[in-house]
Amino acid sequence: GQQYSLKELMYGLMLESYNDCAVAIAEHVAGSEEAFAKMLNEKAKEIGCKDTYFITPNGLDAENEEGFHHTTAEDLCKIMAYCVWESPQKDSFLEITQARAYGEFVNRNAFLDQMNGVLSGKTGFTAKAGYCYVAALEQNGERYTIALLACGWPNNKTYKWKDAKTLFGYGLDTYDKKEIIVEEVLEYIDIDGYVSQPSFSTINQMVV
């Protein structure tokens, strides 16, 4: 049979959503799909996911004695944010997911060219979940992630692009990065007739 490198499998997975690429990667990295799912679940908890349980490496429906394969829009946003901005492999992730094509693989993420600042995105589909999409965008130092679930079924494959633009547009128009000054009283202590004063601290926050 034909042989592929791990790099080629990653492009096949992220650009074309090939399920067999996901399985091959899982078996190569962890030895089995089950062991790989365990790694995924541990990583999901590590980055703050609250309601995610992986069974399959490709996202297809599955169930076992511990539950069913599932996640939430919030957790998907956390995963995308980690991949784009926090992961030690973020540069490689962006290189792959931003490629319009690689060899025989063509990127199905048309949204990359539909809005300024789009950094990455991943499409998905199952009969139960419908068309799904998760993406990351950065403009003027502001960072946003969105997740669309059940965003249409066959014959409505392009709904997700319009909805993604609407959500990102809302975020850009509504929220802003603010510098918040927080007054914090540490403690009052009498020392030789002197009283300590309240201290102030500056916290930079992104309001999203």
Where are these regions (language model features)?
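Conserved catalytic neighborhood of penicillin-recognizing serine enzymes
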Residues: 1-23, 73, 106-120
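Mid-domain, small-residue-enriched loop/turn segments at the edges of structured enzyme/sensor domains
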Residues: 27-81, 85
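Domain-terminus/edge residues, biased toward the C-terminal soluble/receptor-binding domains
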Residues: 49-50, 67-208
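Second-shell loop/turn segments in exported
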Residues: 1, 7-12, 22-31, 60-68, ...
